[in-house]
Amino acid sequence: MSIDDLKSKIPDFAKDVRLNLSSMASNETLTPQQKYGLFVACGIASRNADVRKALVAEAAGKVDASVIQAAKAAASIMGMNNVYYRFVHLASNKDYRTMPARLRMNVISNPGVDKVDFELWSLAVSAINGCGMCIDAHEDVLRKANVTAEAIQAAVRFASIIQSAAIALEAADTE
């Protein structure tokens, strides 16, 4: 399955989603590694099998397997961190902020790809998962690494488009 196959499954009520998928595929703000890593990480984070399969397949022919593995790792580790740190951030009891997380996160310091790219993917997944604390932390790392606001915005735009594709497919499944 490809992005074109995915677009063909998007119903007419979500025409904007189809158009946004097209614009995402032709984006030139990001490097190919950043773009296809976002496809994989956000496709997985969308929790929709069709979206995940299409975007992983799209990336498979365009980037090295190490990029795909690292993007999978970003989605996986953010699945854990986003739940934990969203709780820490939202809990009324602020004592949790001073407690050690006791969660293994070695992949963040050694992702097997450029750390900036991994941070970009982590930011996008954190946006999908709604963890403000993680969003702030990853955005701060990216800005300190001189990543442009346009690249950061593009990553989050990809996340929003990919998530909307998953929701459009779920909505179509109710008809």
Curated annotation (Swiss-Prot):
Disulfide bonds join C131-C134. Coiled coil: none annotated. It comes from Brucella canis (strain ATCC 23365 / NCTC 10854 / RM-666). HAMAP family: AhpD. It is an enzyme of class 1 (oxidoreductase). One of its GO terms (molecular function) is alkyl hydroperoxide reductase activity. The active site is at C131 (proton donor), C134 (cysteine sulfenic acid (-soh) intermediate). Keywords: Antioxidant, Disulfide bond, Oxidoreductase, Peroxidase, Redox-active center. Pfam families: CMD. The lineage of its organism: Bacteria, Pseudomonadati, Pseudomonadota, Alphaproteobacteria, Hyphomicrobiales. Its EC number is 1.11.1.28. Gene3D superfamilies: AhpD-like. Antioxidant protein with alkyl hydroperoxidase activity. Required for the reduction of the AhpC active site cysteine residues and for the regeneration of the AhpC enzyme activity. Signal peptide: none annotated. This is Alkyl hydroperoxide reductase AhpD. GO terms for biological process: cell redox homeostasis; response to oxidative stress. The keyword Disulfide bond applies. It catalyses: N(6)-[(R)-dihydrolipoyl]-L-lysyl-[lipoyl-carrier protein] + a hydroperoxide = N(6)-[(R)-lipoyl]-L-lysyl-[lipoyl-carrier protein] + an alcohol + H2O.
